[in-house]
């Protein structure tokens, strides 16, 4: 798979090891003929050893054959997250360090999660594009401030903080993009 097609959460082969992509930084240096470079921050699967790799947009990283099992978040067992397969009810347990910053998007009963499995071993999760979270703490809206589009900080029910528009109040349910970590709208 070409470097410009790789997304956060993909599992790839790199330097003889298997890695899950956790973060991607894109840069377009001006003095290099417009070649776009990608810096991948990835963790070995299993093991969780961090590795950085910088690649050109046309460089290839072999995709790893894995099963993607549609699952629901069931519960947290100490530092481990337990997901239940939606078809055969197999429980998949992943440590908090494997989940990483995605833990801020996971709430009880969250559906649409794909657990990635290699040789019957869960190695990673891929979250839905957006999740619904509740705002638990945000400053009140300023009177007459609706004409401006100033964002304000909001603490969510998972402990995560994002920037939201001024009209969002405590107790509201909002959509959060799991790729960018940004406000994506009000939830229905």
From Swiss-Prot:
SUPFAM superfamilies attached here?
Nucleic acid-binding proteins, Translation proteins SH3-like domain
Stored Pfam families? EFP, EFP_N, Elong-fact-P_C
CDD domains in the cross-refs: S1_EF-P_repeat_1, S1_EF-P_repeat_2
Q: What's in the GO CC field?
A: cytoplasm
One example GO MF annotation: translation elongation factor activity
Provide the GO biological process annotations. peptide biosynthetic process
Family to which the UniProt record says this protein belongs: Belongs to the elongation factor P family.
- Could you tell me which PANTHER family the record lists for this protein? ELONGATION FACTOR P, TRANSLATION ELONGATION FACTOR KOW-LIKE DOMAIN-CONTAINING PROTEIN
Q: What is this protein called?
A: Elongation factor P-like protein
Q: Which organism is this protein's natural source?
A: Xanthomonas oryzae pv. oryzae (strain KACC10331 / KXO85)
């Amino acid at each position: 798979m070409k470097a410009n097609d790789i997304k956060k959460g993909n599992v790839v082969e790199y330097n003889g090891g298997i890695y899950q992509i956790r973060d991607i930084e894109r840069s377009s240096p001006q003095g290099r003929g417009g070649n776009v470079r990608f810096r991948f921050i990835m963790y070995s699967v299993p093991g969780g050893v961090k590795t950085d790799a910088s690649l050109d947009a046309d460089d290839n990283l072999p995709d790893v054959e894995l099963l993607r099992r549609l699952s629901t978040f069931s519960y947290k067992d100490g530092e481990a997250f337990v997901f239940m397969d939606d078809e055969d009810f197999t429980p998949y347990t992943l440590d908090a360090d494997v989940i990483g910053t995605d833990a801020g998007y996971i709430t009880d009963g969250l559906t649409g999660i794909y657990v990635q499995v290699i040789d019957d071993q869960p190695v990673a999760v891929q979250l839905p594009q957006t999740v619904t979270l509740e705002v638990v703490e945000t400053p009140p809206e300023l009177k007459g401030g609706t004409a401006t589009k100033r964002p304000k900080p909001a603490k969510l029910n998972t402990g995560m903080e994002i920037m939201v528009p001024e009209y969002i109040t405590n107790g509201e349910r909002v959509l959060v993009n799991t790729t960018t970590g940004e406000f994506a709208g009000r939830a229905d």
